[in-house]
Swiss-Prot record:
Cited Pfam families: YidD
Record-linked PANTHER family: MEMBRANE PROTEIN INSERTION EFFICIENCY FACTOR-RELATED
InterPro entries given in the database record: Membr_insert_effic_factor_YidD
Family per similarity comment: Belongs to the UPF0161 family.
Domain of life of the source: Bacteria
Subcellular location: Cell inner membrane
Residue ranges crossing the lipid bilayer per the database entry: none
Main location: membrane
Biological source species: Crocosphaera subtropica (strain ATCC 51142 / BH68) (Cyanothece sp. (strain ATCC 51142))
Function, as annotated: Could be involved in insertion of integral membrane proteins into the membrane.
Protein name: Putative membrane protein insertion efficiency factor
């Protein structure tokens, strides 16, 4: 599942993203953030973090630097 999601995001970045002007308000971009989150936290939690980030990426949010949170050990 994790590899499939990563492949889909990389495909989006390579094939679809270049067709549109850059519009992400964050650094790193939402697709890069989601890739890092999936690699760091796995498919389920990484996808959730990526979805939350994408939902915040709109004109009414200031954006800025928003890195993937660190892994916390319990």
């Amino acid at each position: 599942m994790k590899k499939t999601l990563i492949l889909l995001i990389k495909g989006y970045r390579r094939l679809i993203s270049p067709l549109f002007p850059p519009s992400c308000r964050f650094q790193p971009t939402c697709s890069q953030y989601t890739l890092e989150a999936i690699e760091k936290f796995g498919a389920l939690r990484g996808s959730w973090l990526g979805l939350r980030r994408i939902l915040r990426c709109h004109p009414f949010h200031p954006g800025g630097y928003d890195p993937v949170p660190p892994v916390t050990k319990k």
